[in-house]
Amino acid sequence: LQADRAPTITAESALLIDQESGTILYEKNAKEKIYPASVTKIITALVVMDYLQPDEIITVGTEINEVTLDSSKAGHVLNEKLTVENALRGLLIPSGNDSANVLAAATARKAENDEDMSFAKCEAVFTDLMNKKAEELGAVNSHFTNAHGYHDENHYSCAYDMALFAMAFMQNETLAEIISEKSFSGNGADGQFADDPEAITQDYNWVSHNYLVTDNEYQYAYATGIKTGFTDEAGECLTASAEKGDMKLISVLFKGSDPARWTESASLLDYGFNNYARVELTAAGAAIEEVPLTKHNKLQGDTVPLVYQNALVTYLPTDAVNSVETAVTILDDYKVEEKDGTVKVKAPLTKGEEIATVTYTIDGKEVAQMPAYAGADIEKGTIFN
């Protein structure tokens, strides 16, 4: 249910969601195909974290020579040693395509247990992992052919999918910390090889490309990340995150322009914070209502409580929070309708058995739906009870 007063968005594709529940607060062409450019690196980082530990040391290979001259680069050199965490910084802060290749190679070789794998094979293995990860996260219109997002006609995504990836990304403490950083200055290997004259390491000074995070006229006070992108084909792109009070939001803009990607992202986030409220419709284990029984052991009473197993949290327009209506629908396998129209639940029942669906609506529009469960064991009735 969308609140009024949505901002004007000139980007071709956009989405605003709650970071924790995935509730969509605004959308524009959210499932249409776009080219993601360097925003790709969100899912690249997710795949890396599935296989590598942040403190692992990796060694830079010839994969850094496989990026185009006009790519954004972190500045790695052949045989350099650095931690996975700092390679991720190189990927996410200066948006290094060289970092993407280094991480893809290390991940693929570990996944396949083959340290001698060529980079061509590494890229094929890694992009297969990216596509599997996208499917696992519920993507509907994504396909990846490289780890960095440099344009390829067969490398695409959509705002909806990227929001799913961003939600998973922000759940990872290491990644969430990295993309909140305005800059990074330090040794790529965290000084671990200071006493080894043979080891190659580098000191870096990287500055985030995300103007919502850094100190400038477009800085957004509540911004916490995430990733920028640009190619001629993709336009100016930004997937942003922000936190204010008890709300955490993610905005996604594709095929936009500068400086509109900064101002429109801020406007979208403000729209979410100012016009929606976080509402817990019910707590985990809470009883919804008592429903009448039939064909049951009357010694156990004539009703059974309907309960939720999980909390139901959503975001609603602030002016509609008090207009929520609830409807309980008993599942057909348990439903008995009496002659007077009364709906009852037939025994036997096992505690925790799903027996109903609860639908929440505002002005007839569905805003949430949850399964409901029997809150007690109920025996079948006999001639003795």
Put a short name on every predicted segment.
Residues 1-160, 164, 169-173:
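Active-site-adjacent loops and short helices of periplasmic peptidoglycan-processing enzymes
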Residues 140, 154-156, 160-161, 166-385:
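Domain-terminus/edge residues, biased toward the C-terminal soluble/receptor-binding domains
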